[in-house]
């Protein structure tokens, strides 16, 4: 609890009665502690304050740097752009675009392009 800065009102409180942010941190701490080869993270920073978001991002980067695979599912485009080495955009249940890291860091209008694909725009080339 200390590592992920979980702050319950008291130590007797049940996890289900914690704030959404503290629940989120406990779930992620539990999964990271298991040192998985693959981590599926759905909205890992939902409900967290700025400091906790930064900490979670650093933990995900550590896992990535250890060679772990992370499937990050998020509605936060900046989060995806900052943490991903490849982005797949899903629209109507199908992958409408797959964008490699080189394009993520080099395209100045990448947010707009991803937004078009999220809305069902044309496929990304290369």
Residue ranges and their predicted role:
Residues 1-126:
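Glycine-rich phosphate-binding loops of nucleotide-dependent enzymes
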């Amino acid at each position: 609890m200390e590592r992920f800065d979980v702050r319950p009102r008291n130590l007797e409180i049940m996890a289900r009665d914690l704030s959404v942010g503290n629940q989120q941190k406990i779930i992620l701490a539990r999964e990271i502690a298991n040192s998985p080869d693959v981590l599926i993270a759905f909205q890992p920073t939902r409900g967290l304050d700025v400091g906790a978001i930064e900490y979670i991002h650093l933990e995900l980067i550590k896992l990535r740097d250890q060679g772990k695979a992370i499937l990050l599912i998020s509605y936060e485009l900046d989060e995806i752009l900052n943490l991903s080495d490849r982005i797949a955009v899903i629209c109507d249940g199908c992958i409408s675009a797959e964008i490699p890291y080189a394009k993520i860091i080099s395209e100045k209008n990448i947010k707009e392009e991803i937004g078009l694909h999220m809305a069902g725009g044309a496929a990304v080339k290369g």
